[in-house]
Amino acid sequence: AVKGEGVVCDSRDDERTQRAVAEFAAQLAKTSGGENPVTVADELPASGIRFVLDQTLPEEGYRLDVTPKGVEVRASRFPGFFYAVQSLRQMLPAAVYGTEPAPGEEWVLPCVSIEDAPRFAYRGMHLDVARHFFSVEEVKRYLDVMAIHKLNRFHWHLTDDQGWRIEIKRYPRLTQVGAWRSKSQIGSYEEKPATFEFGRYGGFYTQDEIREVVAYAAERYITVIPEIEMPGHSLAALTAYPWLG
């Protein structure tokens, strides 16, 4: 458990910040075996882990001070607090990312002072789900890893020749037909002769699942950039609606 006054949020912190702090405290409690209740206060104590609103810091920046008395996190908005939480996690044992208690670990933070802000506004990762389909849970795990590394743009490659992955209700054949293939090429296109794995393969995301992923990303300060390719790389769409070719 956190010594002193536990985990305390500034009453001026927004809801997303308070949720991020509560999630961190709950995860820490689950893996360390302690109890870390989160409180919200107008006046913050001198000990424990304190999340203080500081409008002098840039939007995505934060200041993190760990002393023998406790931890103080300062930021002006949710992104800064969120990134500070990622840094706190990274200073703890790796078990903090687990799902089971690890009481044998040494749950101690080193004394440190960090003032951090990103150099680049766009910090992105790309995921191609057309050639190889990833489930919603796998996409969420990908977003979790992005958040750990403080990345903020998720380029979601949803369509290509090999598959159409997003539900469009006006054009149902895009997912009824275009989301599935009867064989998958193994290895490089340059390999001759080509090698194939035969069998029905594919999948797609419903509109509700897309919304779920977008909301999950937003909680991690990640903007989703969906990519739908046209007119090139559109064989999946043309297979579903050949008269469009």
Question: Where are the regions that the model predicts?
Answer:
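Contiguous, structured surface segment used for ligand recognition
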Residues: A1-Y122
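Conserved, mostly hydrophobic/aromatic
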Residues: L28, R77, M125, M146, ...
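The substrate-binding groove and active-site-proximal loops of carbohydrate-active enzymes
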Residues: A75, G124-V136, K192-Q207
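Aromatic/hydrophobic pocket-lining residues that form the small-molecule binding cavity
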Residues: F81, V139, T206, I210
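Aromatic- and acidic-residue-enriched carbohydrate-binding clefts of CAZyme catalytic domains
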Residues: P118, Q162-E219, S234-G245
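Hydrophobic faces of well-ordered beta-strands that scaffold small-molecule active sites
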Residues: R123-L127, F154-W156, V224-I228
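A conserved hydrophobic secondary-structure block that centers on an alpha-helix together
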Residues: D128-D161
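Aromatic/hydrophobic pocket-lining residues that form π-stacking "cages" and hydrophobic walls in ligand
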Residues: Y142, V213, V224
